[in-house]
């Protein structure tokens, strides 16, 4: 009895294709997708008349997953502006990468920008927040500890 493992983070999006392409472009792998609806789905969500598309993507090592969800019903008419990085609640995910600067350049070429600036932190990580589709914030982290030691 008790927790076995961390399974996934759910992310609600308006454009499932764009969100999926963004995360696949960062190295996630598509695991599968489906449409969900019905009484059980309504009860789980605490909403009536739910119909949603779900796409699961996972890290290459299979230890982390994102559940990308596009709700077709019911409508959500309350749309806040993209939240700043310090707004309380789940705000970003972090993925470890190689060659962070090249990834940032590619993301900029694809129309995405950083929230702040690339910074080396405590000679251990090179870090940056990137704003993806629909204002999602993804932190990129490159381990530079071994780079600094050589």
Residue spans of the language-model regions?
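N-terminal beta-strand motif that seeds the catalytic metal site of vicinal oxygen chelate
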Residues: 1-20, 29-32, 90-95, 144-150
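Vicinal oxygen chelate
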Residues: 2, 33-35, 65-69, 78, ...
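Exposed loop/turn and edge beta-strand positions of beta-sandwich/beta-sheet ligand-binding modules
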Residues: 5, 50-51, 89, 124
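Core segments of cupin and vicinal oxygen chelate
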Residues: 12-63, 102, 109, 128
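Short hydrophobic/aromatic-rich motifs at helix boundaries and adjacent loops
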Residues: 26-28, 74-77
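A short, acidic/glycine-rich surface segment
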Residues: 38-44, 75-81, 148-149
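Amide-forming acyltransferase catalytic core, primarily the GNAT-like/NAT-type
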Residues: 56, 73-74
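Short glycine/proline- and charge-enriched loop/turn segments
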Residues: 84-87
């Amino acid at each position: 009895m008790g927790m076995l493992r961390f399974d996934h983070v759910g992310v609600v999006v308006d454009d499932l294709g764009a969100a999926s392409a963004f995360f696949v472009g960062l190295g996630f792998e598509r695991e599968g997708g489906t449409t969900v609806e019905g009484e059980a789905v309504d009860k789980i969500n605490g909403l009536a008349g739910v119909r949603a598309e779900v796409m699961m993507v996972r890290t290459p090592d299979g230890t982390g997953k994102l559940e990308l969800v596009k709700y077709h019903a019911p409508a959500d008419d309350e749309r806040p502006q993209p939240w700043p990085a310090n707004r309380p609640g789940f705000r970003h995910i972090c993925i470890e990468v190689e060659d962070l600067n090249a990834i940032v350049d590619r993301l900029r070429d694809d129309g995405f920008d950083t929230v702040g600036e690339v910074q080396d932190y405590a000679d251990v990580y090179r870090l940056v927040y990137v704003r993806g589709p629909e204002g999602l914030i993804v932190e990129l982290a490159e381990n530079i500890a071994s780079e600094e030691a050589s």
